[in-house]
Structures are given as structure tokens and as C-alpha cells.
């Protein structure tokens, strides 16, 4: 994808036509199924990020000496900011930008590390004999499972076809813009 991204960025109209021919799909392309692996991965990433948030913010509020009943004052802005970053990267990935996909994969790795760290912390608390609410342990296991499902949905032939479709559409949009600029110059 990185090489095709560079070729699209520097290509003329005829070179873009060649790139689009390389990215032609065998059979019929269903545009509604094109982004499903990416959307599934994004939803699983969001769920995996959300799982450790209550325990994380309860710990922050406890250490800061703030009232525990206001913990959602930390959770809501944190998750909203994460959603903004996540959906920006997902949207740019769907538009065919290599750096956005790379950024999304880095974000996904960070979330997987957070979920794994939360699971290890909960297991350590459990084995040390601290009284834990079973919901926190279940949420830590679910966070790791969502991270694994997120990686798995990106490691499918459907996502590979989707990336080809994203790049094809980006090349088509750039070719259309170049054609439009050429037409406007010829009219002037």
C-alpha cells in the first residue's frame, strides 16, 4: 500500500489509469461490504479501549483525592477524545491514505497493550487476594478479546480487497480532479 500511495501522490492522469487497472477487482464489487472489516476492527478497538476506563479513572480519582462518584467526568471526555482520533484515522484510511492506516495500526497496538496491561493487573490483584468485583475481571478479559478480534478482522482477505478498493477510489478521485483542472485550463 505504501508504494501505491506514493505512486498515486506523484502520478499524472495516464499513470493513474495504470494504477487503477492494477487495482481492478475480479468479479462484482459490493461497495457496501467493502469497509466491513475496517468498521468491525474500529468497533472492537473502541470496546477494547472502553473496558479499562472505569478502573483506570477510579484509580486516578482515588490517587488525586477527588470524589469517587464523579468518575464519569474523566471517562466521558477520555472516550470522546479517543473516538475523535479513532474515527479520523478510520475515515482517512477508508479514503486510501497510507499514513492513516499506519496511525490506526499504532493506535490499535497501544490499545492492545492497555487491554493486556489491565488484564495482567486484574489477575495480579486476584492472585494477591484483593477483593475484586468480578465485573472488572470479566471486563479485562473482554478487552483483550476485543483487541484480538480487531487484529483478526484486519488480517482477512476482505480487508486486503478493501484496501485495494480504497486506493482505487483515491486514484479515481485524483484522476477526476486532474481531468477537471485540464478541462478548466482548456476553456480559459
Question: Model-predicted segments: where are they?
Answer:
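Hydrophobic alpha-helical transmembrane segments
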Residues: 69-77, 130-140
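Loop-to-transmembrane helix junctions at the membrane interface
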Residues: 87-113
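Membrane-helix boundary connector in multi-pass membrane proteins
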Residues: 116-138
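Short juxtamembrane and helix-loop transition motifs at transmembrane-helix boundaries
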Residues: 34-41, 60-72, 98-102
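Generic alpha-helical transmembrane segments
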Residues: 47-53, 67-88, 111
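Short, highly charged, low-complexity non-transmembrane loops/tails of multi-pass membrane proteins
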Residues: 1, 157-188
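Membrane-helix interface motif
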Residues: 49-62, 120
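Cytosolic juxtamembrane helix and N-cap/initiation of the first transmembrane helix
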Residues: 2-51
Amino acid at each position: 500500500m505504501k508504494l501505491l500511495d506514493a505512486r498515486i501522490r506523484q502520478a499524472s492522469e495516464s499513470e493513474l489509469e495504470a494504477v487503477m487497472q492494477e487495482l481492478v477487482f475480479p468479479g462484482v464489487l459490493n461497495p457496501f461490504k467493502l469497509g466491513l472489516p475496517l468498521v468491525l476492527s474500529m468497533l472492537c478497538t473502541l470496546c477494547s479501549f472502553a473496558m479499562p476506563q472505569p478502573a483506570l479513572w477510579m484509580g486516578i480519582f482515588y490517587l488525586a483525592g477527588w470524589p469517587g462518584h464523579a468518575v464519569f467526568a474523566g471517562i466521558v471526555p477520555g472516550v470522546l477524545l479517543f473516538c475523535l482520533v479513532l474515527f479520523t484515522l478510520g475515515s482517512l484510511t477508508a479514503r486510501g491514505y497510507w499514513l492513516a492506516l499506519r496511525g490506526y495500526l499504532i493506535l490499535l497496538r497501544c490499545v492492545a497493550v492497555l487491554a493486556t496491561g489491565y488484564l495482567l493487573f486484574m489477575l495480579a490483584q486476584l492472585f494477591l487476594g484483593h477483593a475484586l468485583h468480578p465485573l472488572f475481571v470479566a471486563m479485562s478479559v473482554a478487552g483483550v478479546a476485543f483487541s484480538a478480534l480487531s487484529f483478526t478482522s484486519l488480517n482477512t482477505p476482505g480487508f486486503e480487497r478493501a484496501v485495494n478498493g480504497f486506493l482505487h477510489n483515491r486514484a479515481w478521485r485524483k484522476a477526476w480532479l486532474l481531468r477537471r483542472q485540464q478541462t478548466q485550463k482548456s476553456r480559459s
